[in-house]
């Protein structure tokens, strides 16, 4: 199975031929049959084929292109499957979104528009189609989707077949847990459409999935569900500091710090609000009101390193690559604006990890980990987590903390890491993000191409320069 780059052009032939293929491609595929099946996404038709000389373009009868809902005039890849005598165009990647505004064709996705433009730029350069759509845009019975694709510099609605794979970027946990979504995901599986990053991760589910795995347990802080006074009492008896975290929370929202002091107990929230209590009953009563019946977890407080009393953690982006294997794409240190959370969305800032580890402290016994250590831990935990969870995942934002003794702890795992442009630290001296595709966007598309049947080959390593022989 091999593929070649091409541009498909609509052309009304005078003969009965439906599809003209470059002669070089037909020789490469050893294609001699006068007819074959042409596929794009979920659509396929039989077509009569012939060859053309001196071109890498593919000419297609307009009625065939319309039956396939195949865009023309754009770079694509073509893959011939000899055992099925079929020609497949792609890769065709669908992105499931919560919403978009087609009335603003230059920025229909709001702050996520730059991300989608990056994806479209890569597709235009390497070949492929990207289509963003909502749940209600899909007609399963007809096998079509009405979504947004980029035409030039604007995004337009058009009808396409069901994609070869779907990347889940829904932002609503409630929508994702709906019966509609459950049925929708099952329809994807029934249609053999890879659907990755299947759902948001719950902190408790992550902890439960890893706590019984020997290779992961050493990196997990103690954690229990917050259900009663006894939970607070037991955790604060075992640990001087405990964090109450929303089980379904994100971006550092709703985190509360509980501390046992010589005078009683202290509760602190982001923003500087602090309250003291003489009894644990009073603390629990106030905490119960703050959590408002939402599922909360109690997590052991850790003596994490920081910079000038600013909490510091490390976000490691781990993604599946062009071979479907987990790999670390990027890592950044995040400094909190307050002493409770370090999330960038809550006013934090970023540093390169090497610089952060150099500036952070205090260290006990000089056991300072290296960035390579953090990468290795994040990679190991990602592999173990995917093995333990149901569903298909292709990227995790792994949040790690490092304590003063150099031990690495897992703080959180996010299956929908942010795609806004402010989540990567800029090189020193640069004030604006570079106008090139981020490695995370490239890797996501390479994995999507892989599951679509268009795995991208690695670039060959340059040969070492021949050594010059000195004449004596």
Stretch-by-stretch model annotation:
Residues 1-89, 97:
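Short beta-strand-centered segments at strand-helix junctions
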Residues 18, 294-302, 379-384:
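Short Pro/Gly-enriched beta-strand edge/turn motifs at strand-loop
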Residues 89-108, 166-168:
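Short hydrophobic beta-strand segments
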Residues 101-112, 175-179, 421-433:
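Short, flexible/disordered intra-domain loops and linkers
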Residues 107-231:
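Conserved N-proximal alpha/beta basic substrate-recognition cap immediately N-terminal to
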Residues 131-135, 297-301, 313-314, 387-405:
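A short glycine-rich, hydrophobically flanked beta-strand micro-motif that places a catalytic Asp/Glu
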Residues 228-230, 234-243, 247-351:
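Phosphate-binding site of ATP-dependent enzymes
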Residues 353-393, 402-472:
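C-terminal active-site "lid" helix and adjoining low-complexity regulatory extension at the edge
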């Amino acid at each position: 199975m091999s593929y070649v780059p091409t541009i498909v052009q609509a052309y009304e032939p005078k003969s009965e031929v439906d599809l003209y293929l470059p002669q070089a491609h037909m020789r490469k595929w050893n294609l001699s049959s006068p007819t074959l099946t042409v596929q794009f996404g979920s659509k396929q038709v039989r077509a009569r084929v012939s060859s053309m000389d001196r071109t890498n373009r593919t000419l297609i009868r307009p009625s065939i292109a319309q039956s396939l809902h195949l865009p023309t005039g754009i770079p694509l890849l073509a893959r011939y499957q000899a055992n099925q005598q079929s020609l497949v165009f792609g890769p065709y990647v669908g992105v499931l979104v919560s919403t978009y505004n087609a009335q603003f064709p230059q920025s229909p996705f709001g702050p996520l528009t730059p991300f989608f433009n990056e994806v479209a730029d890569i597709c235009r350069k390497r070949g492929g189609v990207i289509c963003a759509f909502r749940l209600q845009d899909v007609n399963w019975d007809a096998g079509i989707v009405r979504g947004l694709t980029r035409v030039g510099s604007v995004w337009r609605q058009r009808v396409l077949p069901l994609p070869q794979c779907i990347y889940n970027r829904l932002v609503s946990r409630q929508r994702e847990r709906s019966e509609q979504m459950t049925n929708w995901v099952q329809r994807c599986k029934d249609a053999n459409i890879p659907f990755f990053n299947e759902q948001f991760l719950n902190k408790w589910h992550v902890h439960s999935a890893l706590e019984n795995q020997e290779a992961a347990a050493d990196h997990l802080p103690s954690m229990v569900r917050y259900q009663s006074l006894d939970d607070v009492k037991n955790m604060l008896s075992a640990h001087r500091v405990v964090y109450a975290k929303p089980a379904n929370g994100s971006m550092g929202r709703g985190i509360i710090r509980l501390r046992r002091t010589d005078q009683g107990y202290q509760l602190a929230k982001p923003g500087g609000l602090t309250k003291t209590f003489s009894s644990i009953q009073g603390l629990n009563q106030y905490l119960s009101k703050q959590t408002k019946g939402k599922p909360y977890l109690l997590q052991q407080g850790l003596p994490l390193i920081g910079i000038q009393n600013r909490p510091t953690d490390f976000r490691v982006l781990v993604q599946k690559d062009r071979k479907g294997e987990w790999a670390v794409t990027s890592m950044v240190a995040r400094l909190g604006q307050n002493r409770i959370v370090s999330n960038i969305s809550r006013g934090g800032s970023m540093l390169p990890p090497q610089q952060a580890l150099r500036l952070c402290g205090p260290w006990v016994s000089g056991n300072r980990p290296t960035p390579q250590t953090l990468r290795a831990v994040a990679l190991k935990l990602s592999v173990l987590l995917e093995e333990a969870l149901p569903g298909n995942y292709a990227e995790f934002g792994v949040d790690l903390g490092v304590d003063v003794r150099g031990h690495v702890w897992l703080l959180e795992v996010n299956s929908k890491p942010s795609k806004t442009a402010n989540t990567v630290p800029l090189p020193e001296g640069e004030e604006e993000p570079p106008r090139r595709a981020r490695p995370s966007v490239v890797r996501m598309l390479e994995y999507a191409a892989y599951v679509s049947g268009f795995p991208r080959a690695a670039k060959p390593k340059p040969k070492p320069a021949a050594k010059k022989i000195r004449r004596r």
